[in-house]
Amino acid sequence: MSDDSFPPIRTPRLVLRRAEASDAAALAALMSDAISARLASWPMPWTEERMAARIVEWRPVGLICVVERAADGVLVGWVHALRTPEDAARASMGWWCAEAHQGHGYIREAAAALLPVAFERLGVAVVEAGAQPDNHASFAVMRALGMAPVGARFTYVPARGRHERTLFHEIRRAQPPGRRGLRPGTKAASNDADRKGESPCP
């Protein structure tokens, strides 16, 4: 399931809602060179038209949200969860925060709200995120989500037209798809056996 009819998610300070074409101008205005330098697929410059095209392109394959401050509706950033093209049981999360609103924990709060929704609506078993080795802010978000490191790999970065070393973290769904009758935090009997041999964990 993509983000069609995706209802807003509310947290104590934020509202996450489906990105719309009408958000393109505001999102493009927030994207900066400093933010783009930390992202794999957001090359500068960003125009309203280009942002609208991104929204249309990504909506069918996942959940893409603008992040607004609940108190005043100010747009502070973006968070998404997209199915990976190589594995339908896996999704990749990404996020960015406008420079003027960094340092307040907004992305950590937004990502934590989106993660369980991504598992439920996308029906995936694993959610991952990756970042440059020195992107400590993103790794702090990943740890807060309960993600654990799974190692590094070189990935193609369209924003800079090259392959870069990226460190990945991931988290597995607490229970397999189809076992939603279990109480939250309760594992299926076969869960531990299924995990044997697995390595410990954009």
Regions from the PLM with identified roles:
Residues 1-39, 64-202:
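Acyl-donor (CoA/ACP) binding surface of acyl/acetyltransferases
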Residues 50-51, 59, 141, 164:
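A generic membrane alpha-helix/interface feature
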Residues 35-55:
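Conserved GNAT-fold acetyl-CoA-binding loop/helix
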Residues 44, 48, 60, 80, ...:
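Intrinsic disorder/low-complexity segments enriched in polar/charged and small flexible residues
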Residues 55-66:
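A short helix-loop-beta-strand connector motif used in the catalytic cores of GNAT acetyltransferases and
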